[in-house]
Amino acid sequence: AHTIFLTMNDRGLSLNSAEMMKAYIIQQISESDRLDVNHQWQENINRIKNASSYDTSGVVSTEDVEFISTWLRAKYAQTLREGKLGAKDEDFELLGEKFHTWVRANARSVMGLAKSKDFRTLIMTEMTKVTNLYLRIKEYGKKLTPGYEEVFYNANRDLNYQMMLIIAAVCNDDTEE
């Protein structure tokens, strides 16, 4: 019953990795900060979902999962599966669709999340900064913008790792520009 509770929402639908990661992070945060962190998480995710193309097919948007996977891969993946048959999945692959499991296993050792304030900073500072950057890069990829022409050209040539590489290069204390 506990497993079902952790993996299904109040409508009986399965939770995605983003929702399960959020639940884990919120559990690690002090009671006094939970509402603020939850609000910031929701604001970031809503901005990501609202910026994605509108889909009327009835298919559930996975933009939040794609965003978090890109963010975590850019910032925390240290290993990559070898290119041989039967090779074991490493950080990069594990941070794909099931990143919530990787975060639980590596929060302290790889991500440096030991205390409530660390988890709070992850959402309030890092996730928010990456959300802002992600949305800007998406916009620059759609519209030719002076000073960001390369981003536009790369996006329109489907250079898939551009977003991840840009996010990897940015630190929490960098300016917006």
Predicted regions and their residues:
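Polyanionic (Asp/Glu-rich) segments that form extended negatively charged tracts
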Residues: 1-177
